[in-house]
Amino acid sequence: MNKVVSSPNMIVCQYFQSLRRLCYTIEQHDEHNKEQIQQDAALGVILAVTGVEIFVNVYFRVLVDEETYKHAAPYILNDLKKQLPLEKKVKKWPSAVFGKKLNFGEGVGQLFTNLKILRNKLVHFSSSHETIDLPGHKIQGMADTSIYSSLDTHSAINALEVAEQFICEIFRLSGIGEKEFPHALHLWTGKVPTNKTIGNIRPH
């Protein structure tokens, strides 16, 4: 395989562009086609969290090459080498690099935690092996698929919005002002800035 090099933000943009295209596709589904909506919504939730993790990996790797953040380089590079789980990275890295922590107890941090929990329930799914009693017989080995069945069009769109909001919180810690969020999102996720107010990327 030939080696291909690209700008660090390229892969992040590709994942988020894929997610936006998926959200558009879901919106075009017939509302009665619940099966397709749930299939695409599940992929949307998974892709949103994956996109954030790739962003976190690349963004912090780029930052620790800058003079201001070189103090954290050995720490971040070692964690990258160990392939630290996303949960630990988002809790440890901002403090190590910026001297500030993300708040996971409320607001965007809590929304992202909830999204990550949903994603984990989808990708780490296992049969609950339940028994259903029916008149005259039992059905054994059934799985609780309530989480999957709860997915709808909003699930994927919300996942995209929460992912973007969470990335903006990392921008905030790095010193980027709110007025620059749309341009930073464009650079790092490929989201084209519009005339909408900055409030649209804040938590609802």
Where are these regions (language model features)?
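Flexible secondary-structure boundary motifs
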Residues: 61-157, 166
